[in-house]
Structure formats: C-alpha cells, structure tokens
Amino acid sequence: MLRLAIPLFLFALCSFTLFSSARSFITTKPLPIDSFIPKPKLENAAACSYTVIIKTSCSSVSYTRDKISISFGDVYGNEVYVKRLDDPSSRTFEKCSSDTYKISGPCMRDVCYLYLLRQGSDGWKPENVKIYGSSIRSVTFYYNLFLPNSVWYGFNVCNGIGNTKSSQPISTTSSVAAM
C-alpha cells in the first residue's frame, strides 16, 4: 500500500506544481503612477515576440479615437513599450470587443507590471489585458474602469524585487480554465 501511495503523492504534487504555474491572474486594483517614464528601446537586446489581447468593457464608450499606449516589463528592467496601439481608422477598442497585437521587444522573465496610457477626449474602459509569450507565463491584468486622461495607469506586482517597487501582491491561481 505504501509503495502505491508514494508515487501517487509525487504525481499529484508534480501535477499541482505544473498547473499552478501555468497562468497568473492579477487580482489587485490598478493605480495611477505619476513618475512612470517608459524606457528607451535597448539596442542589442535579444528580441522576443509577445501577444497582447486587450478586451474593452461592454460598459465602455462605443469606440474611442483616443491615443492608447502600453508598457510592460519584468523585475530585471526588461520593458516593452508601444507609443500608440490604436488605429482610429480601424475603430479599435470598440465596446465589447477584443483587440490582439503581436509585439516584439526584449526577452524577459514573467511580466510583473503593466501600464496603459489614454490620451484624448472620448474615454475608454478596458476590461482586461492578457499577455502571452514563449518565454513567459501568460498573465491577465484586470482593469474594468475608465482610464483617466493623460495618466499612466496600471499594475506593479514586482514586489520590490529588482529595479521596480510595489506595494501590491501578486496572486497566482491554479486553473485550467480557458482564457
């Protein structure tokens, strides 16, 4: 009986570890940051590809012509910055829709901060932002509020490690639910 129990316990432990590290869900509230300045692009950094999916809330304005910028990174100072994600002629960020972007940037460890910047008069309410990459765990940041104008707004869950500071915890959830 003991021979069977030990391998079964090890299998369960390995399975839990595998699934618990598969996805991160950020459960804190987004905050404004006054002193955030995106970093310039690093010249000789290895390039990795990231998929960013931004879901606009169903309680947002029908669409926005506002300029939307994004910046995300890891605890080691690697950062991806896109000055303008939106394309006013294609009606991006429509109410109840998702917009997907393929973005290249420096290779990083797991993403622990993400900020959005909205500039304009239309307004916009993102529901969530999901980031995928071959070298990182997928992560979802939940906004679900109207972004203020001309203020970087988002999350820093780096827990004070490395070059970034945070007072917000990260919550990793064991889940195999579709994202």
Swiss-Prot record:
Keyword Hydrolase listed: no
Pfam family, one: ATS3
The keyword Cell cycle appears for this protein: no
Protein name: Embryo-specific protein ATS3A
GO CC annotation terms, alphabetical: extracellular region; plasmodesma
Organs and tissues of expression: Expressed in roots, rosette leaves, stems, cauline leaves and flowers.
Cell compartments where the protein resides: Secreted
Family annotation (PANTHER family): EMBRYO-SPECIFIC PROTEIN ATS3A (PTHR31718:SF46), PLAT DOMAIN-CONTAINING PROTEIN (PTHR31718)
Function text: May play a role during embryo development.
InterPro entries registered for this protein in UniProt: Embryo-specific_ATS3, PLAT/LH2_dom_sf
Superkingdom, taxonomy of origin: Eukaryota
Gene3D superfamilies noted in UniProt: PLAT/LH2 domain
This protein's UniProt keywords: Secreted, Signal
Domain PLAT: 48-158
Subunit note: Interacts with EULS3 (via N-terminus).
Signal peptide: 1-22
Main location: secreted
